[in-house]
């Protein structure tokens, strides 16, 4: 790991994010999956730059059974009328309810890495 990456990691105070970034980078190199390196880079940025995506935007831009990865938080504004699988750093309570009511799944980033190590078929959503 380069010196610049270590400096970025030492600025992070959340131990879950630090370990997640390290795991993402290991997976990117080990599984030859550049999607995990991209997500690690986005999570190294300041948290004010993390994605905050509403359910209404997810509903407009996805089809049934899509798999999304959101490097940030999913918010509950809007309605979801089809099932989607969403992996995100965090979910608001209302977003979690709306996704599960529509028949979708809410996963953590760690869970999606285990389920799909190559990252194929995953859309990064911002």
Curated annotation (Swiss-Prot):
GO terms for cellular component: cytosolic large ribosomal subunit. Transmembrane segments: none annotated. It comes from the Archaea. The keyword Glycosyltransferase does not apply. Pfam families: Ribosomal_L18. SUPFAM superfamilies: Ribosomal proteins L15p and L18e. One of its GO terms (biological process) is translation. GO terms for molecular function: RNA binding; structural constituent of ribosome. The keyword Ribonucleoprotein applies. Gene3D superfamilies: 3.100.10.10. Keywords: Ribonucleoprotein, Ribosomal protein. PANTHER family: 60S RIBOSOMAL PROTEIN L18, LARGE RIBOSOMAL SUBUNIT PROTEIN EL18. Belongs to the eukaryotic ribosomal protein eL18 family. This is Large ribosomal subunit protein eL18. The gene is rpl18e.
